[in-house]
Amino acid sequence: MASRTKRNIWRSKRLIIRPVETSDDDFLQSIYGESSDGYQNATSIVPVPQGTASAKAYRAYLEKCLIGCIICLPPPTTPEDESKPTAPGTTSDSPPKKPAPTPIGAISLSAADANVSHHRNTMVGIHIAPAYQGQGYGSEAVLWALEWAFRHANMHRVEIGAFGYNEGAWKLYERLGFVHEGRKREAMWYDGDYHDLVLLGMLKKEWQEKYGAVKHDGKSA
């Protein structure tokens, strides 16, 4: 059997994936509260101001998922960091205090009830803070979630949904390899009109074919 290259599964090219903490409540509140459009693109519930109770409820939901995590950017590093003088009261052997990663969003894979878990299906949920949208972080996080689902959690199928008016989202998911599986016609009320709910999915074999995943024999697909 060919050996596999060990790597940190909680890192992608530009992102760090970390657990949800109680200290994230303010951040979780902000990613929905900063933009009403972002809130309505991420949830179908009637728009209401998001307070601390909503943030705690969202954190509780993430903690109950198959996996629910905070998406972060790593702290910046510069050559100057390596040459900074030792702070008073420390020795040259003392590790400098590193800045914390910057949270930019949340991602989850839904957990199935025990009596239907044998189907090995899950759904992606993702939200990127408005200031970090349009930079490819959402795509990178979804690709990370797909790899985790298929390679580590042995999922058979991953689905994702988007509201019909959010054309940029569902077209992006199609480019990532999700297959357009159907629409729930006029299922969503938004801004004075009814809109479709677009349903997309990806099978494990489709992911392997598109992304050259590592199979059980340790070789690339």
What do the PLM-derived regions correspond to, one by one?
Residues M1-A57, K205-A221:
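A short, well-structured alpha-helix characteristic of acyl/acetyltransferase catalytic modules
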Residues F27, M123, E140, R157, ...:
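Amphipathic alpha-helical recognition patches that constitute DNA-binding helices
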Residues S44-Q133, L203-K205, G218-A221:
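Acetyl-CoA-dependent GNAT
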Residues I128, G134-R151, E167-R175:
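Conserved acetyl-CoA-binding loop-helix of GNAT-fold acetyltransferases
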Residues A129, I160-W170, A187-Y190:
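Conserved beta-strand-loop-alpha-helix junction that forms the acyl-donor binding cleft
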Residues R151-G161:
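Conserved GNAT acetyl-CoA-binding A-motif
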Residues Y173, F178, L200:
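Conserved active-site tyrosine of GNAT-family acetyltransferases
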